[in-house]
From Swiss-Prot:
Membrane topology, from the record: Multi-pass membrane protein
Gene transcribed to yield this protein: qoxB
InterPro entries, A to Z: Cyt_c_oxase-like_su1_dom, Cyt_c_oxase-like_su1_sf, Cyt_C_Oxase_1, Cyt_c_Oxase_su1_BS, QoxB
GO molecular function annotation: copper ion binding; cytochrome-c oxidase activity; heme binding; oxidoreductase activity, acting on diphenols and related substances as donors, oxygen as acceptor
Listed cofactors: Cu cation; ferriheme a
Pathway terms, separated by semicolons: Energy metabolism; oxidative phosphorylation
Reactions this protein catalyses: 2 a quinol + O2 = 2 a quinone + 2 H2O
Phylogenetic classification of the source organism: Bacteria, Bacillati, Bacillota, Bacilli, Bacillales
1'-histidyl-3'-tyrosine (His-Tyr) crosslink, residue number(s): H279-Y283
Keywords of the record: Cell membrane, Copper, Electron transport, Heme, Hydrogen ion transport, Ion transport, Iron, Membrane, Metal-binding, Oxidoreductase, Respiratory chain, Transmembrane, Transmembrane helix, Transport
Annotated protein name in UniProt: Probable quinol oxidase subunit 1
Any one GO cellular component localisation term in the record: plasma membrane
Function noted in UniProt: Catalyzes quinol oxidation with the concomitant reduction of oxygen to water.
This enzyme's EC code(s): 1.10.3.-
SUPFAM superfamilies, sorted: Cytochrome c oxidase subunit I-like
């Protein structure tokens, strides 16, 4: 084994040196706290090895929030560098590393786990399922994601981060990027991508096979519908990325030449592979976000969603078109007029089903009895801001005009107006909306609204000036500029906006901490003043019982739960409980994640033998699992009856309290 020790530490940058010093203390402090409070056994038994979809969802959300912080710090460093002209705060390569990691973290390690966390918590409950179709695979999927996340974040302090942009184009990411940085990108995303693909398959089967028998596809809640269609995109889009990452890994480690022109390779092959995955990836995070808005808007408008079936078809149309637009990411790379025209038209077409969704949300609001809780505020702010992102997207879809906009800050502003308002607003709204389902209490609404106003205003202050900067010719990925360029004032305003967004996020963190100690607990499950419209609100809070539903609920129409509440009925009115079979926890995913992390680390530094040993460890873990005789366990009917009696009693008390107040 010839490990490249000389590449291990990044030298010559004060910021990275401070991180290298601080990171070990942070890890030691975390270990000390867990040891002091004797939490190791609890965490391992109840969380790390859990196959309960709700606990796995919470672990995804914790990781997503942490990555939001990491990606947000990267964004603030970018804005700090560009605040004034000729700034020496960051040198050029460090700046390249920061904007490269910012993009990867926000898409792969923040937005996706945020969405997957909400999938895990909400979808099985919305369809009346006891668990996902493959509980053990669900645990493995999380630890594959976690392994990729850890590896990618190690790059900042060990070996150096990737600096070829989040798109990692060849040949820049090939012979022109020596060192382990790009290897971190390839291996971390590959491992995380395997977990994502497994999650897509798992939830596709879960929705198809585990939903309550009375629930028809066109009657499913929109969040579940968007999840189902998104899983199809995941299953179709991630294999090309897997192939592309594998090919570039062999180029860099085993000296193949798939993307090296001098040896007969083709750099444009990477661009096509990447964007065949990359543009559907946008809809992998956007479509579930649309589903979140489609749950929140009817709830706080006190109306059923307008045009439910048209929303389903619009979602399917967007998913189909998402695979026909990838070339619009490189109109300027010499494809020719015919190809550019085809992809220009297909890109514009995607605005039609998206417009259907926008009009349906507006018509849902029409004549609704709207209340402005913080999830609703994020949902309402999404509509006009996302519209601006969509309109500028249509502008970019015009191939001839794209020659002016391409690789300028106009493009940066466009995709932030789509991804931040479309995805981040939805993630924050969904977190607040379903937080009482997870924890049994609502986040403080005053602090939530401060979060919303700072974040929303800061977002527009930050990114609206970037449209003007782009039209004025400021290139993206530029680490500095001269005073004579005339970009100082707008960059200063943009940085102020980024600081306002950071303050808004801090209000959310304060809300989480404050609410943990101060918010009243609500055991009834229908936590938003009885406004819930779907099956997850029929179950108890916090964290519904492991079995979710004591009996299989009926779902005879989109407003089944609303009708039940209006007539004073509940699915628990049937008291004929039986023993419930549940799967046991398993350490398989946890240990596969450890082997993946260690093996991936050695492969990043091109040390193949230890990586192969870890690969054998993964196979050994899988063989161990295959020879286990594990039939799960049963929750006795008496225990189920006791649990459900407590929920029924809490609901009766709540109903009596409401009647007394009225």
């Amino acid at each position: 084994m010839n490990f490249p020790w000389d590449q291990l530490l990044v030298k010559g940058n004060w910021m990275i040196t401070m991180a290298q010093i601080g990171a070990p203390f942070l890890v030691i402090g975390l270990i000390a706290v867990i040891t002091y409070f004797k939490l190791w056994k609890y965490l391992y038994k109840e969380w790390f090895t859990s196959v309960d979809h709700k606990k796995i969802g919470i672990m995804y959300l914790i990781c997503a929030v942490l990555m939001f912080v990491r990606g947000g710090i990267d964004a603030l460093l970018i804005r700090a560098q560009l605040t004034v002209p000729d700034n020496k705060f960051l040198e050029s390569n460090h700046y390249n590393e920061i904007f490269s990691t910012h993009g990867v973290i926000m898409i792969i390690f923040m937005a996706m786990p945020f969405i997957f966390g909400l999938w895990n918590i909400v979808v099985p409950l919305q369809i009346g399922a006891r668990d996902v179709a493959f509980p053990v695979l669900n645990n493995v999927s999380f630890w594959l994601f976690f392994a990729g996340m850890i590896l990618f974040n190690l790059s900042f302090i060990i070996g150096g981060s990737p600096a070829a942009g989040w798109t990692n184009y060849a040949p820049l990411a090939g012979e022109f990027s020596p060192g382990p940085g790009v290897n971190y990108y390839l291996i971390a995303i590959q491992i995380s991508g395997l977990g994502t693909l497994a999650t897509g398959i798992n939830f596709f089967v879960t929705i198809l096979r585990c939903k309550t028998p009375t629930m028809k596809f066109m009657q499913m809640p929109m969040f579940t519908v968007t999840t189902f269609i998104t899983t199809l995109i995941v299953i179709l889009a991630f294999p090309p990325l897997t192939v592309a990452l594998a090919l570039m890994t062999t180029d860099r480690i085993f000296d193949t030449a798939f993307f090296t022109v001098a040896h007969g390779g083709m750099p444009m092959l990477w661009a096509n592979f990447f964007w065949v995955w990359g543009h559907p990836e946008v809809y992998i995070v956007i479509l579930p976000a649309f589903g979140i808005y489609s749950e929140i808007i009817p709830t706080f408008a006190r109306k059923r969603l307008f045009g439910h079936q048209s929303m389903v078809w619009a979602t399917a149309g967007i998913a189909f078109l998402s695979f026909l637009v990838w070339v619009h990411h490189f109109f300027t790379m010499g494809n020719g007029a015919l190809i550019n025209s085809f992809f220009s038209i297909s890109t514009m077409l995607i605005g039609i089903p998206t417009g259907v969704k926008l009009f349906n949300w507006l018509l849902t609001l029409y004549k609704g009895r709207i209340t402005f809780e913080s999830p609703m505020l994020f949902s309402l702010a999404f509509i006009p801001n996302f519209l601006l992102g969509g309109v500028t997207g249509v502008m970019l879809a015009m191939a001839s005009a794209d020659y002016q906009y391409h690789n300028t800050y106009f493009l940066v502003a466009h995709f932030h107006y789509t991804l931040v308002t479309g995805v981040v607003f939805a993630c924050l709204a969904g977190l607040i909306f379903w937080y009482p389902k997870m924890m049994g209490y609502k986040l403080n609404e005053t602090l939530n609204k401060w979060c919303f106003w700072f974040f929303m205003i800061g977002f527009n202050v930050c990114f609206l000036p970037q449209f003007i900067l782009g039209l004025d010719g400021m290139p993206r990925r530029l680490y500095t500029y001269m005073p004579s360029d005339g970009w100082f004032l707008l960059n200063l305003i943009s940085t102020i906006g980024a600081l306002l967004m950071a303050i808004g996020f801090l209000f959310l963190v304060v809300s989480i901490v404050y609410s943990h100690f101060k918010s009243p607990r609500e055991a009834t499950g229908d936590n938003w003043d009885g406004l819930g419209r779907t099956l997850e609100w029929t179950t108890a809070s916090a964290i519904p019982p492991k079995y979710n539903f004591a009996i299989t609920p009926d779902w005879n129409g989109y407003d089944t739960f609303v009708d039940m509440k209006e007539h004073g009925r509940h699915y628990l009115d049937n008291h004929n409980y039986k023993d419930i079979h549940m799967p046991n926890n398993t350490p398989v995913g946890f240990w596969i994640g450890i082997f993946m992390t260690i093996g991936g680390f050695f492969l990043i530094f091109e040390t193949v033998i230890p990586a192969l040993i870890c690969l054998f460890g993964i196979f050994g873990t899988m063989i161990y699992r295959s020879f286990q005789i594990d039939h799960g366990y049963h929750i006795p009917a008496a225990e189920v009856a006791e649990t459900e009696a407590r929920l029924r009693e809490a609901r009766i008390k709540e109903r009596e309290a409401v009647s007394h107040e009225s």
